[in-house]
Amino acid sequence: MKLRRIDHIGVVVADLPAHVAQLEAMGLVLERVGDNSESNALYYPCGDASVELIEVRDPVIAARRMSEEEQARIEHIAFEVDDLGEVRDLLESRGVEVSWPPFPSGSAMMIWTTAATSGGVQYQFLVRPGGEGGGA
């Protein structure tokens, strides 16, 4: 399994405008907006990776992803890889639960680990178009 690079770090936030202001005050510039039925996601590139700010719309889902006391929390680290099947096989051989089959998000295909089986950290693995395969 080869990790090509860190693609992004996902940060769940309670107050999206406040966190946007913080990133923009540091000189980061909004690259793209992701929007789905559950959340808004704003991507701010920094070098080869991005910071993804995630605002969850549904209060019940938001409570599962972040406690009421938190203003923000790093939710996941995303890695770009060449082959999702290879990642799944390796991680499952080591006892890590992985979502399968891969599912699309924008132009990428992705899988996720279950934090309880991956040392308390949730990891996302994705293949972007033009990658060397999807393993699906």
Regions found by a protein language model. Give the residues of each.
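Extracellular/lumenal glycan-associated surfaces
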Residues: 49, 72, 76, 83
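A cross-kingdom feature marking solvent-exposed beta-strand/loop segments within repeated
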Residues: 6-7, 26, 31-39, 57-75, ...
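N-terminal beta-strand motif that seeds the catalytic metal site of vicinal oxygen chelate
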Residues: 1-18, 74-77, 129-136
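Vicinal oxygen chelate
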Residues: 1-2, 33, 42-47, 52, ...
